[in-house]
Design a protein with these regions (language model features):
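Non-heme Fe(II) oxygenase metal-center motifs and adjacent flexible, charged/small-residue loops
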Residues: 1-204
């Protein structure tokens, strides 16, 4: 599957936020190929239902997750992820992202499967030490459209939201993870699944 075979030109819309940057490419993946990649990932990725401990109680994480890459473990929210080897589809997507981000070489990807609008991820920053000082996070959306919210950690009126459609690419960069939180909120009206792939570089 060749992601470069499409007629429409692809370019980023760059949003300079206070203390960070977010770039959005709405047509990163051709619409006629998004369903094929979605189905392949849904069926072949080794999805896990992780558990998280909060306030002394164990709860299921409200989405399924998977961790793939070059061999680096990753820890977030007390969950230790051991990588599965890259699949062809993941490498296809990674290489095209790297084409649009010269100089970036991602060695890992965290995948999230939101089964419907009840699944979510709460406010957080991707600021784990193994990601380095100012990590570049490249996020591809497939499937259902979901809202992506950001808010500044210390300035309440600094907010940003965008509807992420299937085939879109979001890049978070600069000092964004130091100063901003992001989330995928519950949206009860959404009754279809979404897969999110967040490519990142674990520092050796």
């Amino acid at each position: 599957m060749n992601l470069f075979q499409q007629e429409a030109p692809r370019e980023f819309k760059k949003h300079s936020l206070l203390d960070g940057e977010i770039w959005i490419m709405e047509n990163f993946m051709p619409q006629h190929k998004s369903p094929t990649y979605f189905k392949s990932l849904q069926d072949t990725i080794l999805w896990r239902q992780e558990q998280i401990k909060m306030y002394g109680k164990v709860h299921p994480v409200p989405r399924k997750t998977a961790w793939y890459g070059d061999g680096f473990n990753y820890t977030y929210s007390g969950i230790v992820c051991n990588p599965e080897p890259w699949t062809k589809e993941l490498l296809d997507i990674k290489r095209v992202i790297e084409h649009f981000l010269p100089g970036e070489r991602f060695n890992s990807v965290l995948l999230n499967l939101y089964r419907d609008g009840s699944d979510k991820v709460g406010w957080h920053s991707d600021d784990e030490p193994e990601l380095g000082l100012n990590p570049v996070i490249a996020s591809v959306s497939l499937g259902a459209t979901r809202r992506f919210d950001l808010k500044h950690k210390t300035i309440p009126d600094q907010k940003f939201s965008v509807e992420l459609t299937s085939g879109s690419l979001v890049v978070m960069c600069g000092t964004l993870q130091h100063h901003w939180l992001h989330q995928i909120p519950v949206q009860k009206r959404v009754d279809q699944p979404r897969i999110n792939l967040t490519f990142r570089t674990i520092k050796k």
